[in-house]
Swiss-Prot record:
Name of the protein in its database record: Transmembrane protein 161A
Source organism, top-level taxon: Eukaryota
Lineage: Eukaryota, Metazoa, Chordata, Craniata, Vertebrata
Family the UniProt entry places it in: Belongs to the TMEM161 family.
Function noted in UniProt: May play a role in protection against oxidative stress. Overexpression leads to reduced levels of oxidant-induced DNA damage and apoptosis.
Localization, UniProt: Membrane
UniProt keyword Membrane present: yes
Length: 480
């Protein structure tokens, strides 16, 4: 309580509130099961039997008399005309779905994490505490960890199938994105201002005096190489995680545009949401964003060019707005996915021959049973990007205010003060202080700016590439 004070009380209150309100009030459940989404119900066996022209014998004696003691599975013509009934998607129906509880807990935790962050921002703005730890950082870091866990949980489904097609796609794109991640790191800061080079330089400046005192200065190049390799591996994992969500997003985007043919405003929002990763890439492309804004010919127009700090704040606001826009069009995408059941049945009618009734029912049910996985694939990249943006503002020393002067970074502590010089002190305390000094020299604001900006930019790049590949796949490869 003495260390965190009000923030600890708010954290405990939020955790209790999340636990108590989950059965009664849940944003995740409202987003999916408020009644605006509808699902298709598969035809019953009696309906399909009536379409096939075969009536089921009612008594066992009659079945033996007709030689049906070894009854074959019911089959119907593929072009049989039957209607799929619809019903609203309710919470009672969703409780039996796989990963629904994980989906509800993860999305609700992300919402409460944003709530804690908003409170701490208001708390720091009003009171301005100096010696308190910002507990919203831990909430955001936990949300990032849970996002990676959800990615692993969903991607593991593709590795557990008997067919190796999905597994091969994940591994192939993981290798491709590994190469691209290494190429991105060698792009000059004049082109892509992610801040990796200034961040590594700041880390080197702070760590070098500490490592020299311990005769560990030879590890400095190894640390820099390990950081770059770690970023490349992280980029490869994110690429493998986002390839199938990108393919799914491309399909639901096309279907959502078809369903909203008479709603031009919704189509505009869908197009803007689909291209939002491209806007994120532009925000860190210096010739496109910053240089164009500062060096564009103004002619007779009079307007004030934003400062460096104002541009950084504007970039944060744009990222938050793009995340909210993608959240706003969640239901059109989910409804477009649920309508795949009808599309699969209509595609079945174009084929010749017969098909088992059970397979027809499975084609319809599989779409509904997979809706929570599709929801996680859609929302997890959004949650990851949003919380990285919040961390970028806090740990990177930025400000939400579009002020004319950039906010000053916190002064760095001298390296001599990070290591105790009292020889009579406890050896364990000295070791802990040395580790804290190394971590303090490593996690500088400039370094954290570069790391978080890289994650945000790379997530957007993976989403854009995978969704564009999905458009090409569904329009050309899948059709053929």
């Amino acid at each position: 309580m003495a260390v965190l004070g009000v923030q600890l009380v708010v954290t405990l209150f939020t955790a209790t509130l999340m636990h108590r309100l989950a059965p009664h009030c849940s944003f995740a459940r409202w987003l999916l099961c408020n009644g605006s989404l509808f699902r298709y119900i598969h035809p019953s066996e009696e309906e399909l039997r009536a379409l096939s022209g075969k009536l089921r014998p009612r008594v066992r004696k009659e079945r033996w008399a007709n030689g049906l003691h070894d009854e074959k599975p019911l089959s119907v013509p593929r072009d049989a005309h039957f209607q799929l009934q619809t019903c609203p998607l309710t919470a009672v129906d969703a409780l039996v779905l796989r990963f629904f509880l994980e989906y509800q807990w993860f999305v609700d935790f992300a919402v409460y994490s944003v709530g804690v962050y908003l409170f701490t921002e208001a708390y720091y703005f009003v009171l301005g505490p100096v010696q308190e730890t910002n507990i919203a950082v831990f909430w955001c870091l936990l949300t990032l960890a849970f996002s990676l866990k959800v990615f692993l949980m969903v991607t593991r489904l593709y590795f557990s199938t008997k067919e190796g097609g999905e597994r091969s796609v994940c591994l192939s794109f993981a290798f491709l994105f590994l190469l691209l991640a290494m190429l991105v790191q060698v792009v000059r800061e004049e082109t892509l201002e992610l801040g990796l080079e200034p961040g590594l330089a700041s880390m080197t400046q702070h760590l070098e005096p500490i490592l020299k005192k311990q005769d560990w200065d030879w590890t400095l190049p190894v640390i820099k190489l390990a950081i770059r390799l770690g970023l490349a591996v992280l980029g490869s994992l994110l690429g493998a995680f986002l390839i199938f969500p990108g393919l799914r997003l491309a399909q639901t985007h096309q279907d959502a545009l078809t369903l909203s043919a008479d709603r031009p405003l919704l189509q505009l929002l869908l197009h803007t949401s689909f291209l939002s990763p491209l806007c994120t890439l532009w925000l860190w492309t210096k010739p496109v964003a910053r240089d164009f804004l500062y060096q564009a010919p103004t002619r007779n127009m009079t307007f004030s060019v934003p400062s460096e700090g104002a541009f950084d704040s504007l970039r944060l606001w744009v990222l938050v707005a793009l995340c909210l826009l993608r959240l706003a069009v969640t239901r059109p995408h989910l409804q477009a996915y649920l309508c795949l059941a009808k599309a699969r049945v209509e595609q079945l009618r174009k084929e010749a021959g017969r098909i088992e009734a059970r397979e027809i029912q499975q084609r319809v049910v599989r779409v509904y049973c997979y809706v929570t996985v599709v929801s996680l694939q859609y929302l997890t990249p959004l949650i990851l990007t949003l919380h990285c943006t919040l961390l970028l503002k806090t740990l990177g020393g930025y400000s939400w205010a579009l002020s004319s002067t950039p906010p000053p970074l916190a002064p760095s502590q001298p390296s001599e003060a990070l290591i105790p010089v009292d020889p009579a002190g406890d050896e364990a305390q000295q070791t802990a202080a040395q580790v804290a000094g190394i971590l303090g020299g490593l996690l500088t604001p400039l370094f954290l700016r570069g790391m978080l900006a890289y994650i945000i930019w790379w997530t957007a790049a993976c989403q854009l590439l995978s969704s564009l590949f999905g458009l090409y796949f569904h329009q050309h490869l899948a059709a053929s």
